[in-house]
Amino acid sequence: MNKSKEDLLDSFFRDINPQWQAEIPELSAVFEEERFSPGERLINDWGELYLIVDGIFGKYEKTCPVRYALAGESLMIPNHKHRYQFIALSDCRTYRTSLRQLEEINAHNPKVFYLYANLTDKQQTYLDYRHKLLSLNNQDKFDFVFNKYPDLRSYVKHNELAQFMGISSELLRRLLRDHDC
């Protein structure tokens, strides 16, 4: 059964504000569905917000992976000059809006600010994940990554995965062998 746009958006907003549909009825209208094929890049417009319904994206600083974003997570394009690229690693379905559209709603309905602030906090949590990963000892990195991303090896090459984990390709190969993956 296909879920409606409102049901899909609800999965992102209900934990923040269970009454969002009644209190901010205009919110769903500013989100547009966008689909991406593997290898396709997100439009890198400052302040864009993507809610990932299906699929997985990679966030890269130049060519270095800094984050993987899964269905149920959001991606915010920084509102300043940056060197990030956001690339679909699988077939992806998103809902996209802009900071400008959210500001327009916020001008007459300040409840949008709370939603946006909460999504911004979640972005920081996503970024903190990689910092935590890099601070772990090498033996603990394997479980830390594959508990969150059990299927990641299906989407990224071995060398990229090692780079994301901050370990050598040889060590990753040994960890994979030891874990019988």
Residue map of PLM features:
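Cyclic nucleotide-binding regulatory module and flanking cytosolic helices
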Residues: 1-33
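Short, small/polar residue-rich loop motifs at catalytic or cofactor-binding pockets
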Residues: 28-29, 44-46
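Short beta-strand segments in beta-sandwich/barrel cores
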Residues: 32, 55-60, 93-94
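Cyclic-nucleotide recognition modules
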Residues: 63-121
